[in-house]
Amino acid sequence: MAHRALSIAPPDVQALDIDFYAFSAHKLFGPTGLGALYGKAQRLAEMVPWQGGGKMLTAVNFEGFAPQAVPWCFEAGTPNVAGVIGLSAALQWLNGIDLVAAERWSSNLAAVAEARLAAALPGFVSYRASGSSLLAFNVAGVHHSDVVTLLAESGVSVRAGQHCAQPLLAALGVSGTLRASFAPYNTQDDVDALVAAMTTAITILAD
């Protein structure tokens, strides 16, 4: 999960001699539908655009096309301007906080939520890794999709499903999980809201 590391401990791509590094904006608390690819100049120069499009070409004819120089030859058409502005704002915000302290805060909230949910909900099963700010869990006897619907009605946003990790879930023997992802802007009030909404949801689904 290299792209997730950017909001925790950004890598030194030169010290690590990284050829390519891809990340998505929403993992940095930016807008969805946007990503970026870092590449060494040498590696990018070795690549050939697999298709042509507006703004990435210097010439086009019936035999083919001539691409712009690197990196302009790899992005065709009108860019996602609003998304880029949003990502820029997110990066400025991240650059202004202590990332180590922020991750410690987030993981502490996840640990508190895990303990409180375990105490409040019979059949609670956690899949959280030690020190992680991501809390994946299930409650025996209820389906994660039903739970997430009720949580949304209470104004609590979590994810439900396979989280792009089907092999892991298969190894765990579950069809999906709920996932509460804690971030630097979350507070104890959010933990309270999650526990209250989960308690209500399980009570409703148990009837």
What are these regions (language model features)?
Residues 1-207:
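Pyridoxal 5′-phosphate
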